[in-house]
Regions:
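Terminal leader/tail segments of proteins
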Residues: 1-124
Length: 124
């Protein structure tokens, strides 16, 4: 069974964007993270998916430079996730393509997920 947890960005709690964590419950495990989504307004901008090699890859789902506000939100999200802004790298991406040079380890993703689960402001 899949569960979805949505949170406002820590660095922009009142802006119209949110992070969504999708988990899956298995019989042996509980709440295994399978997908991260970033939304600006109601538009899915970026998905972070786990590949078969165990690493997590970002996939651009919409043009991140659509507006100045969306650009700022993507900048804040990537700064939270990577520790630095990756806005320009995402801006150069084609839609539905992943960036192999922006791979993330499972430890980084789990730390990001736990950070939100412990103290994030829920998005309803």
């Amino acid at each position: 069974m899949k569960n979805t947890y949505s949170y406002h960005l820590y660095t922009a709690p009142y802006s119209q964007c949110h992070v969504e964590f999708v988990t899956e419950n298995n019989a042996n495990e509980r709440d295994k993270l399978v997908l991260i989504r970033f939304y600006s307004y109601n538009t899915l901008e970026i998905e972070i998916v786990q590949a078969t090699d165990g690493y997590w890859y970002p996939v651009v789902r919409a043009y991140v430079a659509y507006s100045r506000t969306t650009g700022k939100q993507v900048n804040r999200f990537t700064t939270e996730l990577y520790g630095e802004s990756k806005y320009y790298q995402f801006k150069e991406c084609e839609i539905d393509n992943c960036r192999s040079d922006m791979v993330l380890s499972d430890d980084v993703i789990q730390r990001f997920y736990n950070y939100y689960r412990r103290g994030g402001k829920r998005f309803y």
